[in-house]
Amino acid sequence: MNDPFARMETRGPQGAANPMDSSRSLGDLGPFPREVGRGAPLAPGARNPATAGASRSQGGGHEDRTADRALGPRAGEELDRESWVREKVLFLLHPERWLGTRGDPAREEVAGAEDLPHAGGEDHGEEPNYPSVFQRQKRISGRRVAPPRDAADPPKYVLVRVEDYQVTQEVLQTSWAKGRMTTRTEEHFVTALTFRSSREGQPGERWGPAESRALQARTGASRVHAAGRRVSPSPGTWLEEIKL
C-alpha cells in the first residue's frame, strides 16, 4: 500500500491523457482565431499592397536613372567646368571673401540667438542688463554673390583664358627586389586659368583672336557676376567672358 511504485502504476493509466481524446476536445472548441495583425485574405484579382509599394519604389528609381542617362556625362562636365571657372575667378579677385575676412557688410550675416527675456517686477519698468547665453557670431555665407552694382555705372567685362594641356614625364623607378632600375612614364592633365580685365563692352558681342589679345593686355578687374563662353582660339583652350 505504501509502495510509491505501486501508486504510480495504479494512477498512471487513469491520469494519462489519450491523444485521440485531446484532439477530439480541441476539435470541439472550433477553429483557432486568426493571428493578430494579419489582415483578411486578398481577393483573387487584388494586388498585394506590400509588393505594389516595392514595385513602385523600384519604378521610381528606374525613371531617375533613365533621366540621368538621357542628360549624359557631357552635360555634367560642362556645368562643373563653368562653375569651377567662376569660383576660381572669384577667389582670385576677392580672396578676402574666401578667407573669411570681415569688413564687407553685404557678405556677413548675423547668426545666434537674441538676448533672453528679461525678468520684471522689481525694476519698475527697467530691463535688467543680463548677458546673453548665446553670443552673437558673424560668419561668411557659403554662396559667393557679388554685391549689387550701381545702375548708373556701365557694365564691365573681364576675359578669362582657360587652357587644358597634358604633361608627360619619365620617372626613374628602382626595383629593390630584382636589383634593377626601370623607367615609368607619368601623365598629368593640367588646367591653366589666366584672366585680364577688358574694356567696357556690350554683352553678347563676339571677339576675334586679335581683339582678345588686346583685351588681355589690360588690368584692374573688380567684381564677378556671371560667365559665358565666347571664343576657342585653339583646341583645348577657350575664353570666358566674365561680367563685372
Swiss-Prot record:
Protein name: Uncharacterized protein C6orf141
Ranges of Basic and acidic residues composition bias in the record: 1-10, 100-127
Disordered: region residues: 1-79, 100-130, 219-244
InterPro entries (UniProt xref): C6orf141 (IPR037739)
